[in-house]
């Protein structure tokens, strides 16, 4: 009712939607895709075991769902994933990434990882780092493990010291920087539709492409909450395809 054009689906285990009603996540996104007036939906933070191949195929063909996924991995070591009691392993995770890229080669995939968990030995971390490096993803969200009273993790003997946590975090952040740079570079010169936001900073405004590339231009109030086609010119820069931004509504 306020004129919003993009909705992000988020929550705790959104892939479990409908368990109490007999509905499924694919039922939800199919219904949302039919709602008029919404330009884009994004799927945020859905676990790999809960995003089905059917849902991935649907997003690839959808009129409104963006080719943008945020998928928690937490660790690229199967041993650590077992300690975390995750409902997936690295084999399943790799399959989901490869499936997304098969049907949406330009999809943006953000991945959550945690470093320094109890039980993450040097060997486990190296396995995780190697696995993450091998994935065709766009960006990592790296978090350092912190102790919480009363959790089962406190029963695990191996503790990672703060200095090692920081070093491991930095290694993964370096990987993230390289992957994001490569993802952006691959799109330079391409046309894209950008939905511009209201935020104004230093005389500039920004928006995002369907596959979550952030672009920046001089502030123009008439473009707020509007979608325009642009040519991606460089890092956070763009060149309009005509003297005036092209309306893609």
Role assignments for model-derived ranges:
Residues 1-16, 69, 91-102, 126, ...:
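Proteins enriched for Cys/Gly/acidic motifs involved in redox and nucleic-acid/cofactor modification
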Residues 2-125:
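Conserved SAM/AdoMet-binding glycine-rich loop
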Residues 18-37, 84-87, 147-178:
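Radical SAM enzyme [4Fe-4S]-AdoMet core and its adjacent flexible, acidic
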Residues 71, 112, 132, 140, ...:
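Hydrophobic, well-ordered secondary-structure elements that form the walls
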Residues 155-242:
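Terminal RNA-binding accessory module
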Residues 243-249:
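A short, hydrophobic C-terminal helix/tail in secreted or cell-surface proteins
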């Amino acid at each position: 009712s306020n004129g919003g054009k993009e909705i992000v689906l988020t929550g705790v285990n959104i892939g479990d939607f409908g368990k109490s009603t007999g509905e499924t996540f694919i039922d939800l996104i199919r219904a949302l895709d039919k709602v008029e007036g919404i330009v884009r939906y994004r799927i945020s933070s859905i676990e790999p075991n809960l995003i089905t191949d059917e849902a991935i195929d649907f997003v690839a063909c959808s009129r409104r769902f963006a080719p943008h996924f945020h998928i928690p991995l937490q660790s690229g070591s199967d041993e650590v994933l077992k300690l975390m009691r995750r409902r997936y392993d690295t084999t399943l995770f790799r399959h989901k990434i490869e499936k997304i890229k098969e049907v949406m080669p330009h999809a943006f995939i953000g991945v959550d990882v945690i470093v320094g968990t109890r039980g993450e030995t040097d060997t486990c971390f190296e396995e995780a780092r190697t696995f993450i490096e091998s994935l065709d993803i766009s960006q990592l969200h790296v978090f350092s493990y912190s102790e919480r009273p009363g959790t089962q993790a406190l029963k695990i003997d191996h503790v990672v010291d703060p200095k090692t946590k920081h070093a491991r975090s930095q290694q993964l952040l370096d990987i993230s920087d390289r992957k994001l740079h490569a993802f952006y570079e691959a799109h330079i010169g391409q046309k894209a539709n950008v939905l511009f936001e209201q935020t104004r900073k230093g005389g500039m405004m920004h928006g995002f492409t369907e596959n979550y590339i952030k672009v920046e231009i001089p502030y123009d109030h008439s473009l707020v909450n509007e979608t325009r086609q642009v040519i991606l010119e460089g890092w956070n820069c763009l060149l309009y395809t005509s003297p005036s931004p092209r309306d893609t509504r």
